[in-house]
C-alpha cells in the first residue's frame, strides 16, 4: 500500500525525535490521514507479511466483549500477552468499552449493538460513534486505548468508517489497525445491507520507534503488491455471530515477514 509507505517517508523526513512512555524513543508527527476505498481491495500491507489470523481473532475477541486473553491464547494469538496480568486479565479495555460501557445508574451500554441499530434506522445521523476512551476507567486498563474512537457514515448506499487513533506504532501496529477496522466496516456493511465506502484512518501521535528504523528502511525498499481480496463467506444473524472461518483472504502475495521488538 503506497499510502502506508508514504506515511513512513513523511515521518522520516518531517518527524521530530521524542521520548515516550516505554523509554524506547520515537520519531513522530502529529496529525496524519489516509483514505482507502474498500471497493477496490482489502487494505492489507504487502511490503511485509501480516498475520491476518491474529487480526481476525483479535477483532472477534473485541466483539465478544472479552478482556481476558484466554480466547486469544486458545487460538495461538499472542499480541496482547505483554500487557496481561498473571490471570490473563487486561482490565476494561476495548471489548468492555465496546460492549458494556458502564453508566452512572449501574447499567451498561452495548455501543456496537446501538450503533448498528442507529445505522439501520437513522443512516444520516452524525452520532454513529463508538468510543473506547472511557476517562473514568483508564487507570484500570492494562493499556489505554490507542485506536480510541470511530465513526460510521452512510451516503449513496455505502458505509464508510473513520478511526481516530491517538497513538500509533506505525511499523508494528498500524497494519493491524487498518486491516481490523476495514474488516469491521465490511461486517457492519453486510449486517446493514450497505455497499462498501471508504475507510479513513486519522492518526494523532503517529510514530516510528527508534528500534524500528532498520526494519522501516527494509520495508521502504520493497515494492507494494496489488491489494488482496477479503470475502465474507456467509451472513450471520448478527454482528456477534461471525466465526473465524467466515473470512477468506485471497490473492495476498506479500514480501517476507520483518521481525521487530514490541515497545511495552
From Swiss-Prot:
PROSITE patterns linked: THYMIDYLATE_SYNTHASE
EC code(s) of this entry: 2.1.1.45
A Pfam cross-reference name: Thymidylat_synt
Annotated disulfide bonds: none
Catalysed transformations (reactions): dUMP + (6R)-5,10-methylene-5,6,7,8-tetrahydrofolate = 7,8-dihydrofolate + dTMP
A molecular function GO annotation: thymidylate synthase activity
Keywords, comma-separated and alphabetical: Cytoplasm, Methyltransferase, Nucleotide biosynthesis, Transferase
Positions annotated to bind dUMP: 21, 126-127, 166-169, 177, 207-209
Main subcellular location of this protein, as a coarse class: cytoplasm
Enzymatic class: transferase
Listed SUPFAM superfamilies: Thymidylate synthase/dCMP hydroxymethylase
Pathway stated in the Swiss-Prot or TrEMBL entry: Pyrimidine metabolism; dTTP biosynthesis
UniProt family annotation: Belongs to the thymidylate synthase family. Bacterial-type ThyA subfamily.
Record function comment: Catalyzes the reductive methylation of 2'-deoxyuridine-5'-monophosphate (dUMP) to 2'-deoxythymidine-5'-monophosphate (dTMP) while utilizing 5,10-methylenetetrahydrofolate (mTHF) as the methyl donor and reductant in the reaction, yielding dihydrofolate (DHF) as a by-product. This enzymatic reaction provides an intracellular de novo source of dTMP, an essential precursor for DNA biosynthesis.
Protein name: Thymidylate synthase
Organism: Shewanella baltica (strain OS155 / ATCC BAA-1091)
Species classification: Bacteria, Pseudomonadati, Pseudomonadota, Gammaproteobacteria, Alteromonadales
Encoding gene per record: thyA
Amino acid at each position: 500500500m503506497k499510502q502506508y509507505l508514504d506515511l513512513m517517508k513523511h515521518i522520516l523526513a518531517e518527524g521530530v525525535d521524542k521520548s515516550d512512555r516505554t523509554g524506547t524513543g520515537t520519531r513522530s508527527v502529529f496529525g496524519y490521514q489516509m483514505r482507502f476505498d474498500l471497493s477496490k481491495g482489502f487494505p492489507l500491507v504487502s511490503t511485509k507479511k501480516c498475520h491476518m489470523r491474529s487480526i481476525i481473532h483479535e477483532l472477534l475477541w473485541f466483539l465478544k466483549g472479552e478482556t481476558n486473553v484466554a480466547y486469544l491464547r486458545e487460538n495461538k494469538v499472542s499480541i496482547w500477552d505483554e500487557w496481561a496480568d498473571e490471570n490473563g486479565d487486561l482490565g476494561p479495555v476495548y471489548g468492555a468499552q465496546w460492549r458494556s460501557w458502564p453508566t452512572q445508574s449501574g447499567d451498561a451500554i452495548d455501543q456496537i449493538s446501538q450503533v448498528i441499530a442507529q445505522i439501520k434506522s437513522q443512516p444520516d445521523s452524525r452520532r454513529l460513534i463508538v468510543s473506547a476512551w472511557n476517562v473514568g476507567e483508564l487507570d484500570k486498563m492494562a493499556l489505554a486505548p490507542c485506536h480510541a474512537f470511530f465513526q460510521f457514515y452512510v451516503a449513496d448506499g455505502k458505509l464508510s468508517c473513520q478511526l481516530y487513533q491517538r497513538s500509533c506504532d506505525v511499523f508494528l501496529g498500524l497494519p493491524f489497525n487498518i486491516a481490523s477496522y476495514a474488516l469491521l466496516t465490511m461486517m457492519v456493511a453486510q449486517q446493514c445491507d450497505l455497499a462498501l465506502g471508504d475507510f479513513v484512518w486519522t492518526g494523532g501521535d503517529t510514530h516510528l520507534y527508534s528500534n524500528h528504523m532498520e526494519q522501516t528502511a527494509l520495508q521502504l525498499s520493497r515494492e507494494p503488491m496489488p491489494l488482496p481480496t477479503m470475502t465474507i463467506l456467509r451472513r450471520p444473524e448478527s454482528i456477534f455471530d461471525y466465526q473465524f472461518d467466515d473470512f477468506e483472504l485471497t490473492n495476498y502475495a506479500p514480501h517476507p515477514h520483518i521481525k521487530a521488538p514490541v515497545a511495552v
